Amino acid sequence: MSDTVVSLTASPAAIRHDWTLAEIQAIHDMPLLDLVHRAGVVHRAHNDPADIQRAALLSIKTGGCPEDCAYCPQSAHHKGANLPRERLMPVDAVLKEAAAAKANGAHRFCMGAAWRKPKDGPDFDAVLEMVRGVRGLGMEACVTLGMLTQSQAQRLAEAGLTSYNHNLDTGPEFYGDIISTRTYDDRLQTLEHVRQAGIGVCCGGIVGMGERVRDRAEMLLVLANHAPHPESVPINALVAVEGTPLEDRPPIDPLDLVRMCATARIVMPKARVRLSAGRKSLTREAQILCFLAGANSIFYGERLLTTANNEADADAELLRDIGVPVPEVTLAAAE
């Protein structure tokens, strides 16, 4: 084992914002059992291991996005994905879904709109009303709307938004292979607007798009050296959708997700590490290994924007089996 890793495993990780790429790669590449143990030690030093957040995710405006993200069926550039373009959902319909999610045990309600950036006007005003409504239900509220101005971020903060999702997707070197219509700096600027408004940052990425391990480490480096760390870090496995440029990418090894969850936990000890898209392909045992490695949030519900997710009953059973208290489901879906 390298001296770098030995020094990192001597005691639970402190909160740092000065990580190097070499350190993060060394952590990621540790023998798996050592890595999971190390991440578990850090996780238990900073978090309650029985506290696994359940977040629900709803697409409030689907399809027709002008961005060309290679993984996304919502892009207007990927005609073969055959995803219809829809208008923004009515506020009352969204809040009905939020109430159902809460009854199913969700703590947070996340809303995603397929926009490059929201325009000020009726649609943005409606999103603000959705945020206020979700907060009124006693839930955390998160939205992902694309790039934001500082003024828009401030208005979302005033509406009570808990967190804003704006993923980096991958490391800066590989980024240009995945998207050309928005720069890495564009993404970082939106994250800065969100921070300046006092909103929690939800930011992570996707593995399995053809990137190198170095690219994954570079993404974590960017996130871990932001101060403060993101409030939550979604770790997604690519869901290869027919009609997108990445439709033929093979599934990743589940242990790659375990390594990403563990590394994210070690370098960002207090962040919510969210096991996100692609979880449906994991066995119960692989998911439990991710929890041991420090994942402490999941998307709860049978769809994630446009892709399938685990059934709520199966998730509830899994969480109960590992000792996480989950209320009995009282409402399976919005009527």
Curated annotation (Swiss-Prot):
It is an enzyme of class 2 (transferase). [4Fe-4S] cluster binds at C65, C69, C72. Keywords: 2Fe-2S, 4Fe-4S, Biotin biosynthesis, Iron, Iron-sulfur, Metal-binding, S-adenosyl-L-methionine, Transferase. It catalyses: (4R,5S)-dethiobiotin + (sulfur carrier)-SH + 2 reduced [2Fe-2S]-[ferredoxin] + 2 S-adenosyl-L-methionine = (sulfur carrier)-H + biotin + 2 5'-deoxyadenosine + 2 L-methionine + 2 oxidized [2Fe-2S]-[ferredoxin]. Its cofactor is [4Fe-4S] cluster; [2Fe-2S] cluster. Transmembrane segments: none annotated. Its EC number is 2.8.1.6. Binds 1 [4Fe-4S] cluster. The cluster is coordinated with 3 cysteines and an exchangeable S-adenosyl-L-methionine. Pathway: Cofactor biosynthesis; biotin biosynthesis; biotin from 7,8-diaminononanoate: step 2/2. Belongs to the radical SAM superfamily. Biotin synthase family. Homodimer. This is Biotin synthase.
